Structures are given as C-alpha cells and as structure tokens.
C-alpha cells in the first residue's frame, strides 16, 4: 500500500504540474529520502485516492516507524515536508507568474491560486469542512462562516510546543523567511509555500494566499521588512497602487490599534482577493461634498459600521482626501458621541481602509474605528458587547468589517447541541457548555415555535442576526438620528481641517 501511495503522490504531482515526466525518478528518490525508506516498487500502480488520503497513509506509516512524532502538529510538519519535495523552486514559480501577468493580471493570479492549492499549502480537504451560510440582513447578504480549517492542536502537540526551544526565526508567520521553512512544533512548516514579489509605492512587498481561505482567492500582501502595521497616507497609496496592478482584486488593511485591529499588528500587511463582500454592494445613502474635491464622489455608506466611501478617477486625489480625513479623525473628540481621540496619552481613533476598482474609477472605503474601553465594556465600547460574546467576542477585523463573520469552531458543536437541547426541553442554563446561550435561546422562544424541521435553520438565521448586531456595536456613529448628526459633525470638522 505504501508503494502505491508513493506512486499516487507522484502521479498527482505530475498531473498538477508540480513536476514533469523528466522529474519522476528524481522526485521518487526525494520522497524516499523524506520517508526514510531505502526503496519501493517502481512499477507499482498508483493508488487512486485524493491527495489528502495519500499523504495521510504515508504519514501514518512514518509515525508507525518512528520517523514522525505521534501528534497532530508533527503530522502536519511531516506531510508538508513531503509536498515540499514536489514544489517547484521560487524562481520557477515567479517566472511563471510574470509570464502570465504579461498576458493579464487575472491569468497570473488564477494560476497562482490554483498552484497554492495544488501544493497542499491551501489544504482543500480542511477548507471544505468550514460551515458557511448567508444571512439576509437589512444591509444586504452577510456571509456567516464557522471556521474549521485552522487545525486545533491536540494535547500532545500543545505539550510538545511548550517544550520546544524558542526561536526568533522567522520573526512572525508573515515574514518572507517562511518560504521553504521546515517549521517546528511552535511554527508551521512552509516547504510548499511560495510568495510573489510585488512593488507597491516603490517598496518591496510580497503576494501570497492565506492557507485558510476565508473567501475566494483570499490573498495576503505583506511588507518585505518586518515592520509594524501603520495606517497613514503611504498606506492609502499602497492600497490603491495594488488595485492599479491587480484591478480584479480588492485589498484592505486592518486598523493599526489593538482591539479594532487584526491578530497580527507586528508585521505590516494587507488582505485582499477576488470576492464581492456585502459592504462593496452597499449603496451610498448620504452624499457628502468636500471643498476642493469636486472631482471625488463621497458619501456615507448604508452599513452598520461608520463608513465613508470615496470614488474618483485619480488615485492621487483619493489619497489626498483620505489623508485629510484620517488626520482629522486621529485628533477628533466628541464627548456627546463618546468619541475620544486619546485618554491618558493612549490614542483611540484609527481607520480600516479598503480599496478597489469600480470600472475605470478607484474607490476607497474608510471605516472609522475607536478602541476606547470602559469598566462596563472592558473589551471595547465599539466592540461586540457582552450579550453577544456567546457567539462572537473576538476582534472585529477587516474581514468582519466587510460583512463576513469568521466565527469560532466551538459553535459547530454548540449549535448542534443547542438544537437537541431545545427540542428535548433540556435545561440549557444548567449546562456547563451551553449555559452561555441560555438568555439568547429564551428570547428566541418568545418569537419562534421550534420543531425538528425548523430549529437548525432558525439558529443559523439568528446567528446571522447576532453578527449584524456585532457590526452595529462596532460602529462608532450609531444608525439613528443622534448618531447620524454626530457623523455629520465629524465630516464638517474634516472639511474644515482641509481648508485651513
């Protein structure tokens, strides 16, 4: 069976374009070396199994022979090592990308995305486990996902990671030094990972795909230098420069402050892709004019968070206006709206920017963020409030801001258990795991009659409704007359700021 799996992996690699016919013997011997085997039957017919199953068979055999450790992380390290043997060198990948880019940017990214899946860097079998549905909200269709593709470490892997020596190389999971890195118990293997150099705003960056693919062609654009996230004029310029080079992609940045930022603030990076989020579809509901910028269409977007959209043919002009708005927002305080530029020297105001092309025009969405905390809301005033934490308590980053909920894996089991508990009449409040959902379920019971046929659908729909509330909580200026008046006050200040 092992000989058939080796033949199967080689057959897969050739069909996927990772190796050519001339590479067969070389690739087989490289695999044997990685597997610590002295030989195999060269005439063995390939096992007709999906790649994930082939790798699983080879890895389990290696574990049984003591070649790989018996835990989940070690298994990932080992099967990535096997795929690394079959992954073309960076110069080959980049040459192919450049040749396709000369034909069209879209052809280049189509190929690179498929390549990143074919190398098993993007593990398609795990992505397929993610649960996804759409919630029709007042703001348009929101994407709801329960993320199951990020591997959860088993207890043995966690224990091994604690014992593993600490290393400062690579400095973080985004650094270019990850390309080809063997990994360790506390850092993922990346032998099958390739990145594409891109120049934006005159500086060296790289393009790669996220291994977890929250949406179609979910890419990461990261600085070649390990430098902290920073939202400034140069960031706007880089975002618009990128969509100038890849007009079929959007690209955005997480905010640069804790709570309202993403999970990695230490390495400057953007996220983008070939996907239309609900926020992009959302219309401008109130046009705004800025003096001296009659060439730019601006307005407040119909969205639960506070979004200003700028659209125009000249990207330099968008950068100029976005920078004016950012500078005004950084220093803006409106106590009546509970907006404070800083407290005790700690800054609170920043922006989550998203860039795209809309036809021949450039477009920037500027999402106003504030990370102030209070005793009542210790995780953030403009953050999911405590009543929603049973569904989502993590940071609301770029992806959520645009209308895609990335919900924790725990919800898969909890929603299934809740369905059974509701139908059986069990005491949810007394349940150690499900008790956090008790208030929510009691409220749902006042609006629904649950049956075996409708309970799962109701829970999914209401999870979507909670996510819409999460976004409303994260909005600085609330969607009522008071909030709208406060938004207008800020915009007036931003206009004056530019006319001084």
Language model features with spans:
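Catalytic or ion-translocation cores adjacent to nucleophile or general acid/base/metal-coordination motifs
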Residues: 234, 243-266, 272-326, 330-333
């Amino acid at each position: 069976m092992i000989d058939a799996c080796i033949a199967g992996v080689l057959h897969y690699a050739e069909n996927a374009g990772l190796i050519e016919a001339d590479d067969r013997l070389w690739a087989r011997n490289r695999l044997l070396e990685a597997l610590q085997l002295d030989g195999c039957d060269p005439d063995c017919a390939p096992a007709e199994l999906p790649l994930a199953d082939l790798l699983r068979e080879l890895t389990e055999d290696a574990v049984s022979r003591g070649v790989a450790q018996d835990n989940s992380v070690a298994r990932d390290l080992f099967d990535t090592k096997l795929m690394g043997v079959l992954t073309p060198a960076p110069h080959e990948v980049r040459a192919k990308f450049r040749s396709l880019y000369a034909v069209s940017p879209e052809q280049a990214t189509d190929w690179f995305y498929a390549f990143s899946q074919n190398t098993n860097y993007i593990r398609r079998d795990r992505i397929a486990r993610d649960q996804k549905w759409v919630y029709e909200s007042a703001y348009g269709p929101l994407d709801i996902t329960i993320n199951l593709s990020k591997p959860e470490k088993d207890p043995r892997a966690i224990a091994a990671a604690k014992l593993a020596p600490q290393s400062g190389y690579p400095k973080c999971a985004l650094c270019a030094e990850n390309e080809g890195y063997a990994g360790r118990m506390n850092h993922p293997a990346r032998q099958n990972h390739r990145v594409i150099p891109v120049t934006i705003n005159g500086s060296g960056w790289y393009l790669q795909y996220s291994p977890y693919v929250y949406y179609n062609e979910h890419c990461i654009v990261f600085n070649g230098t390990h430098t902290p996230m920073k939202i400034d004029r140069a960031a706007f310029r880089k975002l618009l420069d990128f969509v100038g080079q890849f007009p079929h992609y959007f690209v955005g940045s997480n905010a640069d402050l804790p709570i309202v930022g993403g999970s990695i603030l230490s390495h400057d990076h953007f996220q983008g892709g070939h996907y239309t989020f609900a926020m992009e579809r959302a219309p401008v509901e109130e046009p705004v004019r800025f003096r001296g910028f009659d060439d730019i269409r601006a307005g407040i977007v119909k969205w639960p968070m506070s979004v200003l959209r700028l659209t125009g043919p000249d990207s330099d002009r968008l950068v100029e206006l976005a920078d004016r708005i950012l500078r005004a927002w950084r220093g803006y305080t409106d106590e009546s709206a509970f907006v404070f530029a800083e407290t005790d020297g700690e800054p609170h105001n920043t922006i989550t920017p998203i860039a795209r092309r809309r036809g021949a025009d450039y477009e920037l969405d500027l999402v106003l963020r504030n990370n102030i905390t209070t005793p009542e809301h210790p995780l953030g005033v403009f953050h999911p409030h405590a009543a929603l934490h049973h569904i989502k308590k993590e940071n609301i980053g770029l992806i959520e801001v645009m209308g895609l909920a990335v919900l924790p894996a725990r919800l898969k089991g909890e929603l299934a258990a809740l369905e059974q508990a509701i139908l059986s009449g069990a005491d949810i409040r007394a349940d150690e795991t499900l008790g956090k959902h008790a208030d929510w379920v009691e409220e749902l019971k006042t609006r629904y009659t649950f049956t075996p046929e409708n309970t799962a659908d109701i829970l999914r729909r209401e999870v979507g409704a909670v996510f819409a509330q999460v976004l409303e909580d994260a909005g600085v200026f609330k969607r009522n007359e008071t909030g709208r008046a406060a938004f207008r006050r800020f915009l007036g200040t931003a206009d004056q700021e530019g006319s001084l």
